[in-house]
Structure formats: C-alpha cells, structure tokens
Amino acid sequence: MKNSEIVELLRELEAINSPSGYTKEAIAFLADRFRRAGLNPKLTNKGALLVCEHPEPLTVCAAHVDTLGAMVTRLEGDGTLRVTQVGGWPWNSFEGEYVTVLGSTGKKWRGTLLCDNPAAHVNRDIGKVERSAATMHIRLDAEVKS
C-alpha cells in the first residue's frame, strides 16, 4: 500500500463517529476494507473484529475503534448541553474542539466543547477556572429550545 493510500484510509476511518458503544460503523468499514484486501474478517459475539489468515497467527495486532466521548446529562434553558465524560480524558485537552452529538434517533448535531463564559476579553479569570463537568458545556451549532 502506498503512503498516500494509507493516509487516505486513516482519514476515512477518523471521520467515522465511534464513541464508546457506537462502533458498528467503524467495524463495518474495517471489515469491508479487509474483505477488499482478500481477507476473511469475522465478528465476535462481543462485536470485536478478528482477521486471521492462519490457525495460529505469528503476529497479533490489536486496536481500539472507539473514540473518547461524553454523555449528555442535561439540556440547559439556553440550549447548551451539560455532559459527563465517557473515559478518562482531561477536559482541557478538548476545550474549543468541535464535537458531534448523537441523538437517540440517530440524528447528529455539531457543536463545540466550551468552558462556561469562554470569552477571554470579558472573563479575566478564565485561565484560573478548573475545567470539569460543572464548568464545561457543549454549544450546539443549531437553533435549539428546551
């Protein structure tokens, strides 16, 4: 495989939303790619993807297909979302990052993970605020009502 093909494959895989518990799309993508390569992927009862060419493989490669996530705990009156972490990621690592919110019906919304009162030009204490579930929220890029 050429380097450019590997980069394109990784870009396609990275674009798939796969928070913990929602990895079916990423698994299906990988299974399809393995089939195209002439391999025979098998899905386990737990949803893991196994690809074996020999009864006793000489090399084993394991990888996570789920991404770090959060779970909505509350919809605020102004339409922002309060969330709790899924996994042990530090809040400040993702502050200001775009996120995708997966609704219970499968609908997706884009938004941004922000500290409360994120405007540095009016909030002189923004650098001192501890980042936590109590001080962070998701602002959706959509018109919302609660």
Kindly give the residue locations of the regions a language model identified.
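N-terminal hydrophobic/helix-forming segments and targeting peptides
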Residues: 1-146
